[in-house]
Amino acid sequence: MLRREARLRREYLYRKAREEAQRSAQERKERLRRALEENRLIPTELRREALALQGSLEFDDAGGEGVTSHVDDEYRWAGVEDPKVMITTSRDPSSRLKMFAKELKLVFPGAQRMNRGRHEVGALVRACKANGVTDLLVVHEHRGTPVGLIVSHLPFGPTAYFTLCNVVMRHDIPDLGTMSEAKPHLITHGFSSRLGKRVSDILRYLFPVPKDDSHRVITFANQDDYISFRHHVYKKTDHRNVELTEVGPRFELKLYMIRLGTLEQEATADVEWRWHPYTNTARKRVFLSTE
């Protein structure tokens, strides 16, 4: 079993590396094509291979845009089978972190919560794979305040690391009532860049396909690389007006890393993207949108 998993993982990484090399070559050809069409100087870094790239441009067409990629491999059952989400915490969780994990369990339809105990990460991931879990969520805290969320897609990855801030739990709001557990409609806003679409896929594939008559809405809205999570239910007051009610919880997510492997492969998995906060332009740049 372990040999089979290692072989499948190597095959997946090989496909991913080949796709990355092909994407890089395609980007260079696109830059050369734009320079030729606009009658501009060829970029310096492309001049040595300009003739070879121009020769291969003649055989390119728009037909390869929709071919399958490693993303199809990761989420090949998305929309066909409902995701199976497992939620756990860091070791020795406080009472508030346990409450937050319980609320997250209600956010994702069909999710299960597992007490961490003294289990190691590798044992958790192996147990999740053996039971057909598609996504493992781990919540971290600092002095009782949730500060981190890890979303690991199984069995091959990716694993996204988020910082949590401005967390408002349902337990903090009196007389809120019960939460609907219907399959929600999803709204994703502001994920226009290539990385933004990647993050949007990681988040939206945590939810099953909703029914048309569902009155539950979950929003992931990106602004300046901070992803706002909001949870609402709506009801029609008449044939023209709709009443929107926030039911919580609410929080902000800040992406700081995406790894290609699963959670237990931190030491060996390649980093797909990492936020570098200490560069001079870190405050000015946005990565999840092109606006």
Curated annotation (Swiss-Prot):
Q: Which cysteines are joined by disulfide bonds?
A: none
Subcellular localization is given as: Nucleus, Nucleolus
SMART domains registered for this protein in UniProt? Brix
Query: Cellular component per GO?
Result: fibrillar center; Mpp10 complex; nucleolus; nucleoplasm; preribosome; small-subunit processome
Primary localization class, coarse: nucleus
Q: Which residues form the Brix domain?
A: 83-264
PROSITE patterns from the UniProt entry: BRIX (PS50833)
Top-level taxonomic group: Eukaryota
The record, for Pfam families, names: Brix
Q: Which GO terms describe its biological process?
A: maturation of SSU-rRNA; ribosomal small subunit biogenesis; rRNA processing
Which SUPFAM superfamilies does the annotation name?
Answer: Class II aaRS ABD-related (SSF52954)
Q: Which GO terms describe its molecular function?
A: rRNA primary transcript binding; snoRNA binding
Kindly give the InterPro entries that the UniProt entry links to this protein: Brix, IMP4/RPF1
Q: What keywords are annotated for this sequence in UniProt?
A: Nucleus, Ribonucleoprotein, Ribosome biogenesis, rRNA processing
Reply yes or no: does the keyword rRNA processing apply: yes
**In UniProt terms, what function does this protein have?**
Component of the 60-80S U3 small nucleolar ribonucleoprotein (U3 snoRNP). Required for the early cleavages during pre-18S ribosomal RNA processing. Part of the small subunit (SSU) processome, first precursor of the small eukaryotic ribosomal subunit. During the assembly of the SSU processome in the nucleolus, many ribosome biogenesis factors, an RNA chaperone and ribosomal proteins associate with the nascent pre-rRNA and work in concert to generate RNA folding, modifications, rearrangements and cleavage as well as targeted degradation of pre-ribosomal RNA by the RNA exosome.
| Quaternary context | Part of the small subunit (SSU) processome, composed of more than 70 proteins and the RNA chaperone small nucleolar RNA (snoRNA) U3. Component of a heterotrimeric complex containing IMP3, IMP4 and MPHOSPH10. Interacts with MPHOSPH10.
Q: What is this protein called?
A: U3 small nucleolar ribonucleoprotein protein IMP4
Q: Which species does this protein come from?
A: Homo sapiens (Human)
